[in-house]
Amino acid sequence: METLICIPMIFLSEMGAYAWHRWGSHTDVLPGAKRTHDIHHAIVDDKAEGDFMYVILLLFLYFNILLILYLYTYITALMFFSMYFPVILIFFWNFYVHTAYHIENHWLNRYEWFRNDKRIHMHHHTDPTKNFGIATHYTDLLLDTFSSAFPVNSISNV
């Protein structure tokens, strides 16, 4: 049973990342989040890796909230980790891939899928109403915010 929980948790984690990016980072639901994210959007080259660190604070808060919920419920430890682990994995994968998009000679640049995703991400920098997904794009496809059109000069050294 607990193993089956991982699959929807992966889906829900991606949906949560999409929701945060679309409505948390692009609005001021958390004071200062939009301003910080706007700085990130102003950078259309691949040297923006240092401006994404505020997410670590959000991660810390989120996981502590999950821990508190766990302590005050009757969820088994196995079930808790089957929900908690996929969320951690998705977050860190998104964080790693997003940071890699902004490192000029990152080792992932040797892969076509990564270079393509990097272009899609950089399109979001020039059109912040499209491509909110970071490491996957199914949320954008589901919510009609995906665009495969790449603006000219959207990124250097792809």
For each feature predicted by the language model, list its residue ranges.
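Helix-coil boundary and interhelical linker segments in multi-pass alpha-helical membrane proteins
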Residues: 1-6, 67-83
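Transmembrane alpha-helical segments that form the membrane-embedded catalytic/substrate-channel core
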Residues: 11-25, 84-104
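Hydrophobic alpha-helical transmembrane segments
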Residues: 1-13, 26-33, 81
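Membrane-interface helix-loop junction between the first two transmembrane segments
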Residues: 19-43
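Core segments of transmembrane alpha-helices
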Residues: 51-72, 137
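Short membrane-interface loop/juxtamembrane segments of multi-pass integral membrane proteins
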Residues: 36-48, 119-127
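Divalent metal-coordination and catalytic microenvironments
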Residues: 21, 37, 98, 121, ...
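Membrane-proximal soluble regions of multi-pass membrane proteins
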Residues: 27-32, 103-158
